C-alpha cells in the first residue's frame, strides 16, 4: 500500500503534540501518533476492531531538520502489517 496525495496532505498538518489521534479517511481507519512538536511520526492504517486496534499497515515517518528548522528529509516508510 502506498500513501496517496490526499492522505499526505492530511499528514502534513500539525496536530496536538505527543498524542495519539484516531481518524477516518475514506474507507480506512487511521491512528496517528505525533512527536513533541505535533508532527505525525507514526501512522496505522486499515480497519479498526471494536477495541480500536487497527488491522492493516504501519508507516513510520523520517523527518530530519537542520538547526534552523528547515526540512532536509521528509518521507514515510512502510514498516509492514499490523
Label the model's feature ranges.
Residues 1-51:
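Extended, compositionally biased eukaryotic interaction scaffolds
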Residues 55-82:
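Short, compact, well-ordered microdomains
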Amino acid at each position: 500500500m502506498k500513501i496517496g496525495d490526499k492522505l499526505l496532505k492530511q499528514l502534513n498538518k500539525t496536530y496536538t503534540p505527543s498524542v495519539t489521534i484516531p481518524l477516518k479517511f475514506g474507507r480506512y481507519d487511521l491512528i496517528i501518533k505525533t512527536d513533541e512538536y505535533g508532527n505525525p511520526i507514526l501512522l496505522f492504517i486499515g480497519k479498526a476492531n471494536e477495541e480500536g486496534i487497527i488491522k492493516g499497515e504501519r508507516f513510520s515517518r523520517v523527518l530530519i531538520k537542520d538547526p534552523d528548522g528547515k526540512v532536509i528529509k521528509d518521507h514515510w516508510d512502510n514498516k509492514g502489517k499490523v
